[in-house]
């Protein structure tokens, strides 16, 4: 293709990761490389195969790639779909898959940034840790196949839950690599049981569910461990966390309505991370979404803080420290 220069308003474009792109990729939207302020080079036209390796400027480590903001959602849906198909392709090398999972992680990072949760440097570090752990787990390819069967929103929710849980664990000074591995796996797999729940009522607002539909939904932690228990890579500790992820300290959760003292230590972290991710990202149909500080207030003032005190305190500390950092940065 002929690469031509165009003039664009810098406020109308958004940066995307270069590792999304490879020779022969046919992207559904135009892709640009920034030359200078307001000046861009078209490096991919919609639905045309691009040859990125032929561009010296693309190979430059300092070069940055953009799409127009109006096309960003379309681009991310395309990348997510491509990621899922790559994960299920056994002929592709792990390093290629990792690049795309990393791209999806970057999208989750941007969602977090918009919700005022932590900072990009910390989230990027957690993203790298999640990828490292997932690649180090024996047989993780089988787990990736299961994950790829989930809808995009559920996959993003699982990744977001994983990010939050690891940051909470670090705030609680939990440092053992094996613990992070188990926690990450449980977070990524905790909603596998939803795959066995009919979509008809999952798409409805929860206040419209019948008692039978509520009961069906509340069975999904059990269905999840039933689907996973034959995988030798999924340990008993991980299965316990998965079945506990909708419990709470008061004993009013599901499916077993157990109190805090009977919930596993890592299960307490997954429970808080899962609920907090739901509040941030409008995952529940008909529910309001919150930025991070307001989500903390909602848990305290509306729910009456029904979670383990130490875990919730760690989450709150992360939010408070991040807000303080932003105020200091803004005052400079």
Residue ranges and their predicted role:
Residues 212-213, 223-224, 281, 294-295:
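Phosphate/pyrophosphate-binding active-site loops
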Residues 183-187, 215, 228-271, 285-288, ...:
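Histidine/acidic-rich helix-loop-helix segments that form or flank divalent-metal centers
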Residues 39-42, 251, 278-281:
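Short small-residue beta-strand/loop micro-motif enriched in glycine and branched aliphatics
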Residues 84-218, 226-230, 237:
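Acidic/His-rich, divalent-metal-binding segments that scaffold phosphate/diphosphate chemistry
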Residues 133, 137, 192-199, 245-252, ...:
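A short secondary-structure junction motif
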Residues 1-153:
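Non-catalytic interface/linker regions that flank or bridge core catalytic/transmembrane domains
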């Amino acid at each position: 293709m002929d690469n031509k220069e165009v003039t664009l308003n810098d406020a109308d474009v958004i940066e995307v990761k270069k590792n999304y792109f490879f020779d022969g990729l046919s992207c559904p939207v135009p892709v640009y490389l920034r030359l200078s302020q307001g000046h861009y080079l078209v490096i991919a036209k919609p639905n045309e195969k691009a040859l990125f390796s032929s561009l010296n400027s693309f190979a430059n480590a300092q070069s940055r790639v953009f799409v127009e903001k109006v096309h960003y959602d379309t681009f991310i849906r395309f990348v997510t779909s491509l990621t899922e198909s790559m994960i299920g392709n056994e002929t592709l090398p792990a390093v290629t898959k990792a690049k795309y999972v990393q791209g999806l992680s970057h999208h989750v990072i941007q969602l977090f940034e918009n919700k005022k949760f932590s900072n990009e440097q910390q989230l990027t570090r957690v993203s790298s840790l999640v990828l490292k752990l997932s690649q180090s787990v024996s047989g993780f390819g089988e787990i990736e196949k299961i994950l790829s069967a989930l809808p995009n929103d559920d996959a993003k929710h699982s990744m977001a839950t994983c990010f939050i849980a690891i940051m909470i664990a670090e705030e609680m000074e939990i440092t053992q690599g094996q613990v992070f591995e188990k926690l990450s796996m449980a977070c990524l797999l905790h909603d596998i049981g939803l795959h066995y729940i009919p979509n008809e009522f999952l798409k409805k607002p929860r206040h419209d569910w019948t008692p039978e539909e509520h009961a069906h939904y509340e069975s999904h932690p059990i269905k999840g461990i039933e689907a996973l228990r034959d995988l030798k890579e999924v340990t008993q500790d991980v299965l316990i966390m998965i079945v506990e992820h909708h419990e709470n300290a008061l004993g009013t959760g599901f499916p077993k309505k157990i109190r805090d003292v009977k919930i596993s230590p890592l299960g307490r972290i997954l429970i808080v991370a899962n609920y907090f991710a739901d509040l941030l990202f409008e995952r529940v149909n008909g529910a309001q979404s919150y930025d991070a500080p307001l989500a903390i207030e909602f848990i305290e003032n509306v729910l009456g803080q029904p979670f383990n005190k130490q875990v919730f305190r760690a989450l709150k500390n992360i939010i408070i420290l991040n807000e303080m950092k932003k105020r200091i940065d803004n005052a400079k």
